[in-house]
């Protein structure tokens, strides 16, 4: 009888916990304890190069887009071989995050369909933001945008509080940042 009461209580609690709202997925979490000034300088260089990719994607300049992606991949390769971490644990954070980002860039180069390229650019953005959060990037504010649209839940980032959607050429409206990297 005692066990039946416990089971019924758990079932009632389970029924009471109704998840009708869309659950928010945490894609990154800022880790200030991992911050290193040298990493900020190197990551800032990568951010500027990534901005060139977003900008060239917006104007649909395929040659400039491919050049910008290749340049960023070369910079990523260089930084992977020249780690400036203070210890092996933080070095693993740097190397693994940068390698994941590089893998996403390589997948971006392989995409040919525009919709798949958009989705892959979004994956690159999420991987890069995750990398910046993991290394505790603080050199500049990083504003993260997500258009409030069911069809396009893509992320992009910038250095300003407002930005245009690089995924939708017909929408030239300025959007306010949805998140800031350095804030929870």
Regions found by a protein language model. Name each.
Residues 16-19:
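Bacterial signal peptide processing site
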Residues 8:
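Phosphate/NTP-binding elements of NTP-utilizing enzymes
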Residues 26-184:
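Mature extracytoplasmic or organellar-lumen-exposed domains after removal of signal/transit peptides
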Residues 11-14:
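C-terminal motif of bacterial Sec signal peptides marking the signal peptidase cleavage site
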């Amino acid at each position: 009888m005692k066990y039946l009461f416990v089971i019924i209580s758990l079932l009632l609690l389970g029924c009471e916990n109704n998840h009708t709202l869309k659950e928010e997925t945490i894609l990154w979490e800022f880790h200030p304890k991992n911050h290193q000034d040298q990493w900020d300088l190197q990551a800032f260089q990568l951010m500027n190069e990534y901005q060139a990719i977003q900008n060239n994607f917006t104007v649909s300049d395929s040659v400039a887009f491919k050049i910008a992606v290749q340049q960023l991949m070369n910079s990523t390769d260089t930084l992977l071989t020249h780690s400036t971490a203070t210890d092996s644990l933080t070095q693993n954070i740097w190397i693994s995050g940068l390698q994941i980002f590089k893998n996403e860039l390589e997948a971006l180069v392989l995409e040919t369909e525009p919709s798949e390229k958009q989705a892959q650019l979004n994956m690159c953005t999420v991987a890069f933001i995750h990398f910046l959060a993991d290394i505790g990037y603080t050199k500049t504010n990083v504003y993260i945008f997500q258009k409030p649209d069911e069809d396009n839940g893509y992320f992009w980032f910038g250095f300003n509080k407002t930005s245009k959607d690089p995924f939708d050429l017909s929408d030239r409206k300025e959007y306010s940042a949805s998140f800031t990297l350095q804030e929870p």
